[in-house]
Amino acid sequence: MVTNVGEQLKKQPVLRGGGFTFKQFFVAHDRCAMKVGTDGVLLGAWVPVLHARRVLDIGCGSGLIALMIAQRSLPQVQIDGVELEPAAAQQASSNVELSPWAERIHIHQQDIHQFAENHPHQYDLIVSNPPYFAPAIACRDEARDTARYTGSLTHDTLLNCAEKLITEDGMFCVVLPHELGIEFARLAGQQGWFVRCQVDIRDRPGKPLHRMLLTLSRQAGETVYQHLALRQSEGVYSPEFCQLISDFYLNY
């Protein structure tokens, strides 16, 4: 009996500093401008992976979303992450190497424009947690600018690159602040994309909408509209959010 308890303890994730410990992997982010946050976790837990065979994460940062998709998807699924900022790309590579899915995830330190022009593969699932601040007021940190501000990757450019890289019936999924999500969907429609799913997110019931998850496709079809509150009125995580994160967050 003691031996069994000991074996169980060995399997428990080891909590470490400089990053975020999930049930099956650790994401170091101390060298990344943008840290692990709810936006990335939402996208990684939500995107439809059932029919995916080749996945692309544009602006992969620490590798968080790529790792979450690897955990959720079939063993034969191959995942590419593209990251412009050298330190973040290096850290993403390290996170991947230490994960259970090192053979399935490949990190490319490259500009997405060059990647889109030269990469031979197309993807049936593309994901991105893109920059969303206008470049009017820059940060002091150039790497943080790259991660946060659209000057390095405009939404127009993101849509154009995704169009070049997606399969005919592929899905393109993003997470954005709600107001920008509305604008992103409008811009996508002008470029021939169709919204197939939209999730409007608020922190808790009665609070303003603050995030949006979008699934876009080049193929027309029914649009599914959903709502998600991250917390209940008393402040605890909602059952719907717990269901999303239960395979990832410790103690859920």
From Swiss-Prot:
The entry's keywords: Cytoplasm, Methyltransferase, S-adenosyl-L-methionine, Transferase, tRNA processing
KW NAD (keyword) present: no
SUPFAM superfamilies: S-adenosyl-L-methionine-dependent methyltransferases (SSF53335)
Keyword Methyltransferase attributed: yes
Family: Belongs to the methyltransferase superfamily. tRNA (adenine-N(6)-)-methyltransferase family.
Any matching Pfam family: MTS
GO molecular function: nucleic acid binding; tRNA (adenine-N6)-methyltransferase activity
Name the record gives this protein: tRNA1(Val) (adenine(37)-N6)-methyltransferase
EC id: 2.1.1.223
One CC-aspect GO term: cytoplasm
Any one biological process term the GO annotation gives: methylation
Catalytic activity annotation: adenosine(37) in tRNA1(Val) + S-adenosyl-L-methionine = N(6)-methyladenosine(37) in tRNA1(Val) + S-adenosyl-L-homocysteine + H(+)
Function as written in the Swiss-Prot or TrEMBL entry: Specifically methylates the adenine in position 37 of tRNA(1)(Val) (anticodon cmo5UAC).
Gene3D superfamilies, per database record: Vaccinia Virus protein VP39
Matching InterPro entries: DNA_methylase_N6_adenine_CS, SAM-dependent_MTases_sf, Small_mtfrase_dom, tRNA_Adenine-N(6)_MTase, tRNA_adenine-N6_MeTrfase
Organism: Yersinia pseudotuberculosis serotype O:3 (strain YPIII)
